[in-house]
Swiss-Prot record:
Coiled coil: none annotated. Residues 1-17 form the signal peptide. Disulfide bonds join 118-292. This is Secreted triacylglycerol lipase LIP5. The keyword Hydrolase applies. It comes from the Eukaryota. Keywords: Disulfide bond, Glycoprotein, Hydrolase, Lipid degradation, Lipid metabolism, Secreted, Signal, Virulence. Residues 498-512 have a biased composition (Basic residues). GO terms for cellular component: extracellular region. It comes from Malassezia restricta (strain ATCC 96810 / NBRC 103918 / CBS 7877) (Seborrheic dermatitis infection agent).
Amino acid sequence: MMYASLVHWLALAVALAVPFVTALGSVPYPQDDPFYYPSENGWQNEAPGTILRQRKIQAASLGIFEWKLDAWQVLYRTAGARPDKPSYTVTTFLVPSHAHRDRVVTISSPENSNFIQCAPSYAFRKTGVLEIANFEPRWEQMLYTLFLAEGWIVNAPDHEGPESAFSAGRFGGHMVLDSMRAANNFKPLQLSSNPMHIGHGYSGGSTPNGWAASLHESYANELNVVGWSLGGSMTDPLYTLNSLDGKPTSSLVVAGAIGLMDAYRDEVGNLLDDEVWTEEGKIAEKVMRNSCVYESVIRYFGTTFQSERYIKGGRNLSSWPQMRKISNMNTMGHNPRFTPRKPIFMFHALYDEEINWHQANKTAVEWCNNGANVRFLTYSSTSLVHVTTYLLNLPYIVQYMRDRFNGKDWYGGGCQFDVESQNPALDVNVLGERFRGILEAALDMLGKEIGPNDSILKNRLKAGQNPNTHHKTKLHVLKKGDISPGEGGDHTKESKKAAAKFKAEKKHGKHH
C-alpha cells in the first residue's frame, strides 16, 4: 500500500505527466492488448498454470530505461476467488545473466487499484516515453535488482487478475501459486526439474503473497516452496479499510470494497451500487475503476468515505453482512485450515501509519497456534513508518532468501517474535550500507548487465545488517500454548495506550 509520504511530491508530476503519457505511449494498455485475454474457447478446461500465450519483451524502468536481461510475459490459466472458478492473468519473468535455474523469487508488487491499466506487467514494458502515472508497482520494480543480482529468476504476477480485484486475498493467492506453476511449465526459463520457489510481498503485495502461503498446502502442494517473506501486511481487509478512512490514502477504502465485491460478484451481485453507495459514492467508484492509485489518492486525499455523502445512511462498510462474510473469508489466520506450512519471515513497524500492526501480529499468532513456522520482527521506533521499514529491511529479506535457498532455518525454526527497538537509521554505518546498496542497485540496472557477476551486492550483507545480530532485543519465543505477543500499533488512542503498556512492561523486565 502506498504511501502518504510520497503523494505530495508526486501530485504535480502525475498531474502534468498523465496527459502526455496517455497520448504518446507506444505499447497498448492492457485493456486494449489482445495478449491479456485467451485467444480460444476451452481455456477453462486447462490445468492451472497452463501457458495460454507467451511473448518476449524489452523490460524497462519508467518506460524508457532498458534492463539488460531476458524478459518474457505469459498469459496463464489460474483460478479466481475459489479453486473451481477458472480465470486467467499475466505474469512477467525476468532472467538475469548467469541465472540459477533452480531458484525463483515470486514478487507480488502492490497495485492497489481497480483498473487493469495499473497492472505490474504493463509497468515492465518499454513504452518509449517516461511513465510515472502508474508509480505504485514501478518504484518497487527498481528494487528487483537486489534479487536479480543474486542470480535468482524473478516472477512477477498480475495478482489482481482481469477483475483488478484489489484486497481479495484468496483470489490473488491462487494467481500467485499458479504463476509459480506457469514458471515451472515455461520451457524458455530452462528451470531444473524441481526448482525452489520463494514468495515475497510488501504492503499491497503482502495480501496475495500471504494468501499464497496459506493456500499452498491445499491448492498447489506439488510446488517446491521453501519460504515466504511478507511485511507491512494487510491481513484483515475490513480492519485495514476502516483504519484508513479519513487518512491520506483513504481512497483505498473504496478501492478495497470494490475489489472484494468484484471477486465475489456471483455471490453478492451489485451490492455496492444497489445498497451501499450514494450518487457521490458511485462517482468515486467510477474514478477508482479508471485510475491508478496515486491519481485516486490525490483526488480524494484525506476523505472520510464512511459518511452520508458517500454511503447511504453514513454506515460503516462492516454493517453489511455480505461484506463481513467476504472479509472474514479473506482474513489470514481466520480459518485454521489455511495455515502456512513453510517458513515465514514477517516484519512490521509498530507505528505503521498505513497498515495497523495489530492485525499482522494477530495473524502471526494465530498461524503459530496452528503449527506455522514464523519469525515476526517488530520495529518499535516511532520514526520508522511504512515505506522506510520496507527499505531498511531489504538486506534482511535477501539474507532470509539466501538462507532458505541454502536449506538453513535462518533463525532456528519454530515461532519467534522479536522487537528491534533502536531505529536503524540512527546507526550511520547501517544507514550508509543499506541505502548505498539500494541506490547502487537501482542505478546499476540502467545500462549494465544484471546478474550475480556484477559488483552490487557482493559483501553487502554483513553482520551489522543481519537481524540475528544487529540491535535485536528478543521479545519472546512462542511456544505451544504460550502466546503473548505484546502490544503496539498506530497513533489511535487505543494503540497509544497499548504501546505505553508495552514500554512499561519492557522497562520492568517483562520483555527482555
